[in-house]
Amino acid sequence: MPVLLEAKNISKSYLVNSGLFGGSSVSVLHDVSLQLQAGEILAIVGESGSGKSTLARQLVMLEQPDSGEITLGGKSFQSIPDIHRQVRMIFQNPAASLDPRKRVYQLLEEPLINLTKLPGSKRAELIYHTLDQVGLNRGQVSRYPHMFSGGQRQRIAIARAMILSPKVIVSDEAVSALDVSVQAQILNLVMCLRDEIGMSWLFITHDISVVNVIADRVLVLYAGRVMESGSVTDVFENPAHPYTQRLLQSVPGSGGSDSAVAVEEIVPAVAQMMEQAGCAYRHRCLLADQHCAESEPPMISIAGRSVACFKEQVF
């Protein structure tokens, strides 16, 4: 499949402790590269603080990266005038991302008014068609967001993102706050939309079980750096990077000794690790040696599988 969305060497830092005499910056993303193919669901995994949401904001142009380039269909984002129409985002909390003062019809009509020149009749037709696609009742368009369940609000958020027929939807922890049964419904909806209309998804999550269900490929992010990427089958059945192995051990029922809580404790000082030389994971890696402390491992790619680790021999 052709590459649709590509990020090359994206880096992002933020100013902290600013004051009268200046401040210091903390690197949150460091040379992150990824490719999203047409009609694909690519998952980005990593625990809190790994840079997942920051990466999402760069990919939808909510923020500008410090360096690197993002392209859509081979064209730089900067040269695409309607980029916000072609790449849309779904946020984690629909209650916060949906204006509580607006009815469903207004929420769905707003992007059509702002980003298209469609007349009112065509906007209405598209709104009702999109409601049908996400499984919402047309008779509910006059309701406000607070009148819906969490799963229904997330369907509204999905409808709002897809109503412009974007090429890519970036989903940032969009199902993490939902209970298991509602989560399954939303995941099924995402897969159906991909299969029926060929929409590409970049699915950001910390939940490995979700990735197993929904994704074609997975990219593992740690301390703002890519540790490993490849097909879900390859990466999860034969993890090459020690951090990926640790993540998989944390999944309940995996047989690993770690707990899900332990994974959240892997990065006690992410900011400091990002600023130091060498492998970002070396402080927690049982295989780390002096080479890992002095040099950052390059990303090695073979047949669509990539890993950044000096200790990995064959994958």
Which residues does each predicted region cover?
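ABC transporter nucleotide-binding domains
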Residues: 1-237, 307, 313-315
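Charged, flexible cofactor/metal-binding loops and thiol motifs
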Residues: 17, 231-315
